[in-house]
Amino acid sequence: MKVGVCCHDAGAAEIISSYVMQKNIFPLYCLSGPAIKVFERKIGTIDNIPLLDIVKNSDWLLCGTSWKSDLEWNVIKEAKKQQKKIIVFLDHWVNYRERFIRNNEECLPDEIWVGDHYAEKIAKDNFLNVKIKLIENPYLLDIKEQLLRLGKSRVESNSFLYVCEPIREHAYFQHGDERYWGYTEEEALRYFLTNINEISKVKRLVVIRPHPSEDFNKYDWVFDEFNHKDIKIDNKKTLLEQILGSDIVAGCESMAMVVAILAEKEVISSIPTDGRPCVLPHKEIGSIRDYL
């Protein structure tokens, strides 16, 4: 049976590309945005085909979800129209219902896959009439395999890795308010850098990694506000390489923080005191508030 794969955001692309590789599937692709780089990094050059063609020429479809792009939502709608089975693999642990709504119209898939028991419970609470299937997160399985091969770095590198995400843009797109969750990504990074000496008395290099969907120069303002000799912005290495090269990983609610837990790094949420608590369900994640 021919499978069609559709993705836009990097999070779902990491999961589905790993699934495709692990299952030795050779699908048709309809990709856009950050997903293209993810798939091509892991699989090679992708032959992208139009939305209508991928639905028409596939026996069933597997797609992610996007908070900004309508690509997957339109694929779900078209698959329903053509009576093709459509499965969505959900990434992360928040905003599940909202992912399937555009202009007050909800369009749900035939089946939803989730990668862990936390996500399974959230999905079952949100989608009473959709089949929910638990499949161990293929992306994290790949990470675990790489860690076994590379070895979990325990070298004291005296460096922080700060993983970014477009919180302000997401909040505005979804709720019309950049500070809907009580903070922005700039405020969180500023909160982290302001309190860095409370977290560690040892002087450390701070490596800031922009999110795949963010402009590389988005955080250049930190060089004007803080000691630029101890800070650099870098996304040239892979996420795992940067995590293994650091001893402490900080961020707000990024999936990268979960990867850092697997690598047995100290992980800290940088959400300011006025922000909502970190939604990541992993108890290993600390908070800057714990150090103040």
Predicted feature residues:
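Short, surface-exposed amphipathic charged segments that create phosphate/polyanion-binding patches used
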Residues: 145-157, 243-253
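Active-site and donor-binding regions of nucleotide-sugar-utilizing enzymes
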Residues: 4-145, 165, 251, 256-258
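Conserved catalytic-core segment of nucleotide-activated headgroup transferases in glycan assembly
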Residues: 14-22, 148-222
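A donor-sugar binding/catalytic signature common to diverse glycosyltransferases
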Residues: 71-74, 88, 235-281
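Generic structural signal for residues in well-ordered beta-strands
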Residues: 27, 132, 206, 230-233
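Nucleotide-activated donor-binding/catalytic signature segment of Leloir-type glycosyltransferases, i.e.
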Residues: 220-235
